Amino acid sequence: MLSLALIAIAYWPANAEPLAARQRIAFPDARLDVCGLPWFNEDKPALRRLPLRLKDRFRPAVWDLAQDPSGGRIRFRTDSTTIGLVAENPHFSNMHHMASVGENGFDLYVGREYVGSAWPDASGKMAKEWRVSRERRMRDITLYLPLYKAVTIQELSLDVDAHLEPASPYAIAKPIVYYGSSITQGGCASNPGGSCQAILERKLNADFLNLGFSGNGLGEPALAEAICELDPSCIVLDFWGNPSADQYAAALPVFVDILRRKWPRMPILVTSPFYFPAEQSGGDVARAQSAKRLTTQEFVEKRRKGGDRRIWYVDGLKMLNREQTAGLVDGVHCNSLGFYFNALGLEPFLRKALK
């Protein structure tokens, strides 16, 4: 087992005082890859998940949530021993069931290793410097953006003589697109890098796009049509959480039909509900969860029997079951442990679909 002293050689907290000489890189910059926000080049420097030109196609609630850059990442390679960030989160808030870092803040990773986080002060401003190593060599850096609040980035900074270049490409460069609810959006991971999608990104070395919309993942055709503008490797439909059982049964076939008109062979995974503790007492929650599980399974089976062999049913109970409820923060939304369970359950299906 490594001692804390040995760990500290590689990573230690940022200095209390800013480093004097810095190489400052205004955002955006061609050497900084913006991932998970595929329409960024249309609307830059805005960090949003849907393009401005499609605004009128979406309900206002969906458009407002699209300003939250969940799944967005800034990636680059550098030999700098320190990384600095200046950003602003003007509308930061604190939900009662979600850590402020996950809701409002940033995570910094070197390769696949977590280094630290940044979060806004009382005025919504962030100025953070991380010391990532004593050793001078090129590394891939990933900065995960907030899951639930809009943000602007003013600049990144490096050692004054450091090199900067675009990040190493993902092994799976075409993004996995996830569409769904607040759970899909990342509620309630403690950190931006702790969402299910971010965990799978690191496991699979795969780019991704998060189109989870808190309370508003209703399977609307406008979202399917927006996805059809992209070039994904796989699509994960995870929107069981928001519609009623009847709404879900009506929306799912329409959503998939739109995708299939564009991509007859695109891998599509459809998840069913994971376990809610309220199910054990029966009642409306148990009935709705059971109905959605049955709808999902029967829909996928019917498609496959009809010749669509590139669609798969993902049993949500493989993503979080009754024995894993410590992974829930409020009986519904996942904490970071819950998202780890989700990722473990979804990973084998993704690996199969992406072969």
Regions found by a protein language model. Name each.
Residues 173-197:
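Catalytic nucleophile-elbow at a beta strand-turn-alpha helix junction centered on a G-D-S/GDSL motif
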Residues 200, 217-261, 273-280:
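Oxyanion-hole/transition-state-stabilizing segment in secreted/luminal serine hydrolases
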Residues 1-175, 351-354:
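N-terminal secretory targeting modules
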Residues 197-210, 301:
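Short helix-loop-beta junction
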Residues 95-98, 186-194, 286-290:
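Glycine- and acidic-residue-enriched helix-capping/strand-helix junction motifs
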Residues 276-355:
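Catalytic His-Asp segment of secreted/periplasmic serine-dependent ester chemistry enzymes
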Residues 263-268:
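A short helix->loop->beta-strand "cap" motif at the edges of active sites that frequently abuts
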